């Protein structure tokens, strides 16, 4: 039996989609222009974000994405924050949200793949 995809990815600035389930902000830094009580955030799990060093090294250079994804997965290997997100995905649909413009080449996309078991 194929497991249903329970993790989606979105920009925090997008309107809430009814299929989003629990939205989880996965950025280390709070997004500009978003109030702390904004419903588009859901819960904030900054500890699952890439380290400052890795984020600065990657700096959204597409040619570095594969290496970034590999390094980020290594950072998450024994992450308690990732373990908490895994528990959440077992109970409901989860949508990691990020302020990143290019969501498909972001840590949120890598995180979604991990949580979906890919």
UniProtKB/Swiss-Prot annotation:
Similarity-based family: To E.coli YeaO.
Protein name: Uncharacterized protein Mb3100c
Pfam families to which the protein is assigned, alphabetical: DUF488-N3i
Species whose genome carries this gene: Mycobacterium bovis (strain ATCC BAA-935 / AF2122/97)
PANTHER family for the chain: CYTOPLASMIC PROTEIN (PTHR36849:SF1), CYTOPLASMIC PROTEIN-RELATED (PTHR36849)
